[in-house]
C-alpha cells in the first residue's frame, strides 16, 4: 500500500493514522526523511516522537503533533495521567536543542550505530541458520530474524547471557513465535559476533537427532 493511498483512505473513511517515529532520527544514509505527517494535508495523522531512543532512555520526554480535534482530549488525558512533565528536564532539553548539541550528538551516535548494524548484518548473513526475511533498512536499532521456535531458543540463550526478544512479546495474542528481535546498539562489535555465534551453536544443538526442531 502506497503512502499516498493510505492517506487518501484515511481521509475518505474519517480515521486517524498514528505515526510513531521514535527511531526516525536514527537514519544512516543521511537522506532527508519524509514522514506521513509531513505529507498529510487532511489533518489525519497523529505524530509521536521521543528522545528516549536517540538521547538517553531515562529521559521520558516526547512530543505530539495532533489533529486539532484531538488536542483538548489529549491535554486532559495527560493532565489526568501525570499532571505535568518535569519542568527542569524540559528546560534542559530545550537548551540542548537550541545550542545544536543534539545534532552533534546524533551525528556521532548514527556513525556508531551504522558500524554496529553492518557488523550484525554481515554476521547474520555468514551464519549457518539465520537469515534476514525483510529488506535491510538504513536505520533503526535492531534486526528481525526468522527461526522455527523463537521462545524455545530464547529460553536457552538467556542461560548463555544472550539477551534478545521473541516475537511473542510483540504479539497481541502471544501466538507469534517464529521471529527473534536482535538489537545491536547496546554491545561492542566483538560481542555482536559472539552473540550470533552463540545463536548458531544453540540452533545446532536443537537440530541434533531426537531434538524437537526441524527446518523445512
Segments from the language model and where they lie:
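PLP-dependent class I/II
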Residues: 1-216
Amino acid at each position: 500500500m502506497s503512502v499516498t493511498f493510505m492517506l487518501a483512505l484515511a481521509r475518505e473513511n474519517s480515521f486517524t493514522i498514528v505515526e510513531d517515529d521514535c527511531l526516525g532520527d536514527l537514519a544512516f544514509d543521511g537522506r532527508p526523511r519524509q514522514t506521513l505527517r509531513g505529507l498529510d494535508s487532511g489533518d489525519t495523522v497523529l505524530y509521536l516522537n521521543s528522545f528516549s531512543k536517540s538521547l538517553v532512555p531515562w529521559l521520558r520526554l516526547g512530543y505530539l503533533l495532533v489533529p486539532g480535534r484531538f488536542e483538548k482530549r489529549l491535554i486532559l488525558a495527560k493532565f489526568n495521567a501525570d499532571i505535568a512533565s518535569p519542568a527542569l528536564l524540559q528546560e534542559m532539553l530545550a537548551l540542548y536543542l537550541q545550542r545544536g548539541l543534539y545534532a552533534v550528538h546524533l551525528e556521532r551516535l548514527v556513525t556508531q550505530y551504522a558500524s554496529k548494524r553492518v557488523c550484525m548484518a554481515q554476521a547474520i548473513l555468514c551464519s549457518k541458520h539465520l537469515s534476514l526475511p525483510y529488506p535491510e533498512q538504513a536505520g533503526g536499532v535492531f534486526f528481525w530474524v526468522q527461526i522455527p521456535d523463537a521462545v524455545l531458543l530464547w529460553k536457552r540463550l538467556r542461560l548463555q547471557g544472550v539477551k534478545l526478544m521473541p516475537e511473542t512479546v510483540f504479539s497481541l495474542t502471544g501466538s507469534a513465535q517464529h521471529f527473534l528481535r536482535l538489537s545491536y546498539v547496546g554491545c561492542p562489535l566483538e560481542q555482536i559476533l559472539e552473540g550470533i555465534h552463540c545463536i548458531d551453536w544453540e540452533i545446532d544443538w536443537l537440530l541434533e537427532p531426537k531434538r524437537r526442531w526441524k527446518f523445512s
